[in-house]
Amino acid sequence: MKKIIKFVALMLTACLIFTGCNETDTGEGQGSKVTGAVQNHDGSDPGTLKVYCFELGKADSFLIYNNEATIIIDAGERGQGKDILQYMENNDIKGIDMMFITHFDKDHVGGAAKLIGNTEVKEVYTPVYIKPSDDYDNFSEKVKEKKTPVIALKENTSFEAGGIKIDVNVAAKEIYEESPSNNSSLIIRVSYGETSFLFTGDAESIRLKEYIATKPEKCNVVKMPYHGNYTKFMGCLDEFLDLVQPEYAVITSSKEEKEADETKELIEKRGIKLFRTRKGSVLFESDGKDVKAVQMS
């Protein structure tokens, strides 16, 4: 049974566990159903949810925040943490409630040590599988220095914070023979009222098929797996897109390492609006019923 963790309770009980410009409106979303705007349990209004997709080349980082909570999924490469911190400063974001590292490749964990060292990060969540590297060592040393709780998720887990629901789907195996780091990726669904955002890390075919088998619900926005790669998926991208039916898709790619043309075609033939971070950062805003998007030039 999926383990449900309430964010407030988690703040009190978490312990250190560490192992080894165009604008478009959309229609209604497909997340958990509410009537009207998002409300907290006490009836207060947490405000507009913003999801900022950083332009970091072929690297991932997504800052998710409203008036009451801040969540980050991945932290880009080493040297890119400063860009995230600058955005936080510019937008008066004082700290991070939850950091999720989808997997330990350098383009997802590289900037994490900088963030942890320079702003308050209350908790970090990771997969079980560790990919040894200098970036991992820097991350490990910094969380120990700051006494930041790190929890390796071993089962599907849900969180709530500031009216935001986070559902984390974990890999079925602790280690895979093929692409063990990519296929350890946490797949994270963020829901806000009737709207939802799906983040797939660098999941390859094996991992994506696991997730497809859960029959995921539709979402408003999907971050395409593995930087828009096509050859790693053996046709399952079609099935994935047919299930989640997003209005928007985001690909994290660079001018030097672009997404596959085949992936772009799969997205566009379905009428999905495609954003590529190599063309600029992307900001999504949700009021709990509708999603708006703008790409920064």
What are these regions (language model features)?
Residues 1-6:
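Positively charged n-region of N-terminal signal peptides that target proteins for export
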Residues 16-20:
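C-terminal motif of bacterial Sec signal peptides marking the signal peptidase cleavage site
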Residues 23, 31, 130-182, 248, ...:
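Binuclear metal-ion centers of metallo-dependent hydrolases, dominated by the metallo-beta-lactamase
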Residues 24-53:
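N-terminal, intrinsically disordered, polar/charged segments of Gram-positive cell-envelope systems
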Residues 39-44, 64, 155-163, 188-190:
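Short acidic-hydrophobic surface loop/beta-edge motif
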Residues 53-61, 67-69, 73-90, 100-117, ...:
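Active-site-proximal loop/helix segments of hydrolase catalytic cores
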Residues 66-67, 192, 285-290:
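Short acidic-glycine loop/turn motifs at beta-strand connectors
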Residues 127:
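Divalent cation-coordinating acidic motifs and surrounding scaffolds
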